[in-house]
Structures are given as C-alpha cells and as structure tokens.
Amino acid sequence: MKVVQINTTYGVGSTGRICVEISQMLNAKNIENYILYTQGEGDCTLGIKFAGSIYKKIQALKSRIFGNGGFNSNFATKRLLNELDRIQPDIVHIHNIHGHDCNLSMLFRYLKKKQIKIFWTFHDCWAFTANCPHFMMEKCEQWKIVCEHCPQIRRTSWFFDRSRTLYNRKKKLISGLDLTIITPSQWLADCVKESFLKDYPVRVIYNGIDLNVFKAIRSDFRTQNHITVDKKVILGVAFGWGKRKGLDVFVELSKCLPEQYQIVLVGTDSTVDKQLPNSIISIHRTQNQQELAKIYSAADVFVNPTREEVFGLVNIEALACGTPGITFRSGGSPECYDETCGSVVDCDDIDALEKEIIYVCETRPYTKEACIRKAKEFDKNTRYKEYIELYERINVAGTERG
C-alpha cells in the first residue's frame, strides 16, 4: 500500500503537524508514504514540495482579481500530478488544499480517471461552500442549497462575486469521486450531512496531541512574568488572533474582571499588541511546544471564546496540562469538554463568561486529574492510528459503503 497526503503546509500549523504525525505512524508500520506540500519549515525529509511562496502569492493575487479561487495554480498542480504519476499511490489523503497552490479541476479529474481511493479530512468548511472556510459569524446557510451573493466575498475577491459558479463547479467535480470524508468533530460531520456531500461516507476522527509534550509540569512562567501567587491566570491561546478567535472578548473581560485576575494571551504579534490594554500580558507566537506546556500548566483556567471553530485543539492541550477550560457554544469546540473538566457558555455572552471564570477560579470544581483523564482520550497515537486502520480496511475491502 502506498499513501500520499496532500496539504498546504508541512510540519507547521495544526494540519502540517497532523500530516507529519500520520506519516510517522505509517513509517513505523513500513508503509510507503509521501507528503506533497507547498510551505514547510525544518526537516522536510518526508515531504515533496510542489510550489514555492512567490508562486503562491501570484496565484493568490489572480484569485483576488478574478474571483476564481481554487481554479488557478495550473503549473503547481501539474507538478503535483507528475509526482502522483511517479509514486502511483493506492490512497490519496487530502487535507487543506485552499492555499492558492492547487487547481481543483485538474486534481479531481486526474483522481477520477485513475480511480484512486481518496480520503479527505475537512479541517474547515471550505470543501462544501463556494470559497468560505467558515460561515458561522455571518450566520450564512446558503451552502445547504447553493452559494450566491456571498456576504464574505471581499475576503476572497476584490471585483467579482463568482460564488454560485464556484459552488456549482466544486459540486460537479467532487461528484463521482471514490471518497471517504473525515471530520475532526461531530459538529462538522453534521454540517457535511446537510451539504451537497451528504451521500458520501463520513467518519469522525478527533485531532490528537502529544501527551509526552503537553502534560502538567513545574512552571516558572508566573515568576518570569511577575505574576504574584494571589492572582488567577486566565489564559487564551490562538494562532491568528482576531474577532473570530475572540480577541475583543478578552479586551472586554479585562475591563470587568476583578484586579486579582490576570489575562495572558499567547500567539500574538506586534499588530495584536496595539489592540490590547496594558493589563493583558502578551506572549508572541512560538513553535516551542514545551514552553507552551509550561504556560498551560501555570494557568488557573483556559478560556477559548472562539466564534468559529471546527474542533479546538488548544482546549485539549490545556486539559493535558491539568488546566480546565471554558468555551463558547460554537462549532466543535464544546466537544472537547464534559462535566468533569470544563464548561460552555453561549456565544458572545460576556456576562455569563465572566461569571463562569470567577466560579471556576474560586470554587475549583474541576480537578487536575479529571482534566488529564479527559485529555487522554485525544492521545495522538490513538487518534491517528484510526487513520491507519481506515486506510488498511479500505485498501483491503475496496470502496467503503455508508
């Protein structure tokens, strides 16, 4: 069995790390596998790069001008298809392919012609919309019937609204693929069943974390940042702070929480810093997971006021470090918690969120042991083993039904 994964990134970001971790598990079973990617850092010995950053910027500009995202990048896609011809995979596992590096028409026609078994992990909602990875903040449900007059069009196109055309092209191209869809949350699986992809088999495989890295450890974070022992640390972590991730919520919380509550945000940058009051501690983005585990371990409660989230891996990372969480009732984020380790409040209900933060910090209803126990359900070795088992089952049985 030969497996090829296709993703925009290699080793960076959540999807890039997931690809590498799946590849490592395949290597451990002596299964030949490759990762085709366009952006990566560090040792990319497991991967094959098929487009560069300058090329991608040109394709992004073309998409903005002509409003045809997903249908440019002919040269890069030709290189990708040449690699597939060379490798002759039994399985192609698609992750994110909306980074201005892949032409859907060329890729899907090739896969249909070659009758290759496809797994597609949806890390967002882009596959069944015209061109939107998320739609919750807009409260848009056009994707259930047909996308048109897109309320988010300026995010992807400067001049033309081709949402109806893109939606119909995508629907036609995906039809007839030998496809199994994988989602990292039940919420997203439910969305798929309301989309034009409803007749395809869908499997939920939650994302996993490395429990050897994310664990409760002794931390000097408070000392380094001059946080006194009497203060409660309210932690937020995101990589791409903005309204979608709830940056404005933390600004509001800083105004209403008592003085003994210290908000810490991780994953910021100089632009985000300008939007924050001096009372919030800002930690710029880091790829050092050990340092991140120390910060999680130092917090009293992890708060994720996300408004659009497919799953919420940061929730699990915090739990693994013994820190309970609170999240908005949005997307798949609530699926990370149960009554033993965290709580959920309605989206945008700042008053309820403030009260829940104070309740969790003052009464400590969730033990460190319960949080860690919940996190063990998301051990990457267990979760990504499900992918390998699915590959092997499909490879033996042929096309999975239902």
Report each predicted region and the residues it spans.
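Conserved donor-binding/catalytic core segment of Leloir-type glycosyltransferases
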Residues: 182, 227-245, 251-255
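Short hydrophobic beta-strand element within catalytic cores of glycosyltransferases
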Residues: 324-327
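Aromatic "clamp/platform" in nucleotide-sugar-dependent glycosyltransferases that forms part
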Residues: 307
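Nucleotide-activated donor-binding/catalytic signature segment of Leloir-type glycosyltransferases, i.e.
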Residues: 267-290
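Short alpha-helical donor nucleotide-sugar binding micro-motif in glycosyltransferases
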Residues: 294-299
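Acidic anion/phosphate-binding donor-loop and adjacent secondary structure
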Residues: 190-193, 209-224, 274-275
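Conserved acidic donor-binding segment of nucleotide-sugar-dependent glycosyltransferases
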Residues: 339, 343-350, 359-364
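A charged, aromatic-enriched C-terminal amphipathic alpha-helix characteristic of glycosyltransferases
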Residues: 365-395
